[in-house]
């Protein structure tokens, strides 16, 4: 089992990027949730426009699927400038980054996704570009090689990462604006899925929106994916409208329960409860019991279960909490 196989994966699956682009908010006034981020960015953007300056460099971090790319697009739209998009793994050589930087117009936004995966050589090029709007490049090879400086137009670098701790200090310190995106509450996800349904021309009742939102693991990308799958169910098994009952039947059929857990989440929790008496159980034993690799458990399955308080990670191993027992209606033996 890999993350991309799961309906409730926060990673991008197949052609979702193009679909999400169609329903993505374009301006801060359309942006739902993250009130602290929205308020701060409104002020920073308005101040930069009043001064006629490029917006300061922005670092956006947080779990996948929370809208880092969406926020980068909104910032460029609000500033009225072009957005150039790339990612850390794509920028393999210093020349790749230099080509992008030299093609920027004044105040343009350069968005680098997965910025924590930049190679050290490419990262070194970024330092003077971010700080002084200058590009240091080498011309020629061997003894005849020489360094020249090119002036760059003022620009805004927006870096996005799910692993802010993996950034080097010199790179992290060059971002004047740092924004952390948090998991969304159900109420915000209800607004998001209602807006998405409207963009897609779907009839979605408040009860249907609530069922989708509460099972979305606090992640808009999952909300929108579930909406598309429930739409399919509603068109085939109902009259096309998505109400609470239709949404519940569709999501139950898709094996997404009221907590947003899928088959693999439940399999892991029940293994700890039934096979290991609630734990503690070592990671290798747990991996063998459910037929998964330990890396899959650590990186894919565990994080959300731990965050929601269903699993505890202790020095002796994994323990199922009272929440886990209650979820399955199992009485915990003392």
From Swiss-Prot:
Gene Ontology molecular-function annotations: ATP binding; ATP hydrolysis activity; four-way junction DNA binding; four-way junction helicase activity
Binding site for Mg(2+): 69
Region Small ATPAse domain (RuvB-S): start-end pairs: 185-255
Gene Ontology CC annotation, any one: Holliday junction resolvase complex
InterPro entries: AAA+_ATPase (IPR003593), AAA_lid_4 (IPR041445), DNA_helicase_Holl-junc_RuvB (IPR004605), P-loop_NTPase (IPR027417), RuvB-like_N (IPR008824), RuvB_C (IPR008823), WH-like_DNA-bd_sf (IPR036388), WH_DNA-bd_sf (IPR036390)
SUPFAM superfamilies reported for this sequence: P-loop containing nucleoside triphosphate hydrolases (SSF52540), Winged helix' DNA-binding domain (SSF46785)
UniProt: ATP binding residues: 23-24, 65, 68-70, 131-133, 174, 184, 221
EC assignment: 3.6.4.-
Residue positions binding DNA: 294, 313, 318
Keyword Manganese: no
Domain of life: Bacteria
Tagged with keyword Nucleotide-binding: yes
Primary enzyme class: hydrolase
Region entry Large ATPase domain (RuvB-L), spans: 4-184
Main location: cytoplasm
Keyword annotations of the record: ATP-binding, Cytoplasm, DNA damage, DNA recombination, DNA repair, DNA-binding, Hydrolase, Nucleotide-binding
Domain notes: Has 3 domains, the large (RuvB-L) and small ATPase (RuvB-S) domains and the C-terminal head (RuvB-H) domain. The head domain binds DNA, while the ATPase domains jointly bind ATP, ADP or are empty depending on the state of the subunit in the translocation cycle. During a single DNA translocation step the structure of each domain remains the same, but their relative positions change.
Function: The RuvA-RuvB-RuvC complex processes Holliday junction (HJ) DNA during genetic recombination and DNA repair, while the RuvA-RuvB complex plays an important role in the rescue of blocked DNA replication forks via replication fork reversal (RFR). RuvA specifically binds to HJ cruciform DNA, conferring on it an open structure. The RuvB hexamer acts as an ATP-dependent pump, pulling dsDNA into and through the RuvAB complex. RuvB forms 2 homohexamers on either side of HJ DNA bound by 1 or 2 RuvA tetramers; 4 subunits per hexamer contact DNA at a time.
UniProt family annotation: Belongs to the RuvB family.
Known partners and oligomeric status: Homohexamer. Forms an RuvA(8)-RuvB(12)-Holliday junction (HJ) complex. HJ DNA is sandwiched between 2 RuvA tetramers; dsDNA enters through RuvA and exits via RuvB. An RuvB hexamer assembles on each DNA strand where it exits the tetramer. Each RuvB hexamer is contacted by two RuvA subunits (via domain III) on 2 adjacent RuvB subunits; this complex drives branch migration. In the full resolvosome a probable DNA-RuvA(4)-RuvB(12)-RuvC(2) complex forms which resolves the HJ.
Record protein name field: Holliday junction branch migration complex subunit RuvB
Native organism: Yersinia pestis bv. Antiqua (strain Angola)
């Amino acid at each position: 089992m890999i993350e991309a196989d799961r309906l409730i994966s926060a990673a991008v699956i197949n052609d979702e990027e193009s679909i999400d682009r169609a329903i993505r908010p374009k301006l801060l006034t359309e942006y739902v949730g993250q009130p602290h981020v929205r308020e701060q960015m409104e002020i920073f953007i308005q101040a930069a426009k009043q001064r006629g300056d490029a917006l300061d460099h922005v670092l956006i971090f947080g779990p996948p699927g929370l809208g880092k790319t969406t926020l980068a697009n909104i910032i460029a739209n609000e500033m009225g400038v072009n957005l150039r998009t790339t990612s850390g793994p794509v920028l393999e050589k210093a020349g790749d980054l230099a080509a992008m930087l030299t093609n920027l117009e004044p105040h343009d936004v350069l968005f680098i996704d997965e910025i924590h995966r930049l190679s050290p050589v490419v990262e070194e090029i970024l330092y003077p570009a971010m700080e002084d709007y200058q590009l240091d490049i080498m011309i020629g090879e061997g003894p005849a090689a020489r360094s020249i400086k090119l002036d760059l137009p003022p620009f805004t670098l927006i870096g996005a990462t799910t692993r802010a701790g993996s950034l080097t200090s010199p790179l992290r310190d060059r971002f004047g604006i740092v924004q952390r995106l948090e998991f969304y509450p159900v109420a915000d996800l209800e607004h998001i899925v209602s807006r998405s349904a409207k963009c897609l021309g779907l009839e979605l009742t408040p009860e249907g929106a609530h069922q989708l939102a509460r099972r979305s693991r606090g992640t808009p990308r999952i909300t929108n994916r579930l909406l598309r799958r429930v739409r399919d169910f509603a068109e085939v098994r109902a009259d096309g409208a998505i109400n609470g009952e239709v949404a519940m039947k569709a999501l139950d059929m898709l094996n997404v329960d009221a907590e947003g857990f899928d088959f693999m989440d439940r399999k892991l929790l029940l293994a700890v409860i039934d096979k290991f008496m609630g734990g503690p159980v070592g990671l290798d034993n747990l991996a063998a019991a459910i037929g998964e690799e330990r890396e899959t458990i650590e990186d894919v399955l565990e994080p959300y279960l731990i965050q929601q308080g269903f699993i505890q990670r202790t020095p002796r191993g994994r323990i199922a909490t009272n929440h886990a027992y209650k979820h399955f209606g199992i009485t915990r033996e003392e």
